[in-house]
Amino acid sequence: TKYDLYLKTEEEKKIQREKQIELTQEYNKEKNLALPKMLITSGFSFEGYRIVKYSGYISGDDAVQVNRGTAGFFSDPTNVGEKLMQSLTIIRRNALRELKEAAYDLGCNAVIGVDFDYLTLDPQTANSSGGTTYLPYVFGVTANGNAVIIEKIEDDEA
């Protein structure tokens, strides 16, 4: 009957979804084990390794918003520099993690030529509906590099 066919189709869809979830979990597990082992350098080679494949230019980004005082002399002072320094380490690490993930997604195990670019968006003040809106400072960081596959050079090859 049509209903039996419908039930069979739904059961097959459920099995496919479960398989996809299982594959995704396995992929994420492998990725989480591989990322900490990935080699990163600002240079263009690794001593004791040879580059066997260049996979292209990649980047990872992150940003943070830092609020500013909104009531002039009556507001609590916001030390933008202090808040930025607290956030900068975190957003640099996040950008570097994204960079590693991009390399992993290309099948690579290392990144060469890594550098960081920084972006600052000064806050704007907007007037709307009779009030003033104080927009936050925005600071961003981008980690750039070239994804590569490297192999360890064996002692007999050196």
Locate each region found by the language model:
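Intrinsically disordered, low-complexity, basic-enriched segments
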Residues: 5-8, 80, 112, 151
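Histone-fold modules and their flanking histone-like tails across chromatin and transcription assemblies
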Residues: 25-78
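Terminal helix-to-tail segments of small alpha-helical proteins
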Residues: 19, 105, 116, 134, ...
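Short, well-ordered alpha-helical segments
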Residues: 58, 63-122
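A structural boundary/capping signal
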Residues: 10, 45-47, 54, 106, ...
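C-terminal edge-of-domain segments
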Residues: 128-158
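Basic, amphipathic N-terminal segments that precede the first structured/catalytic domain
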Residues: 1-39
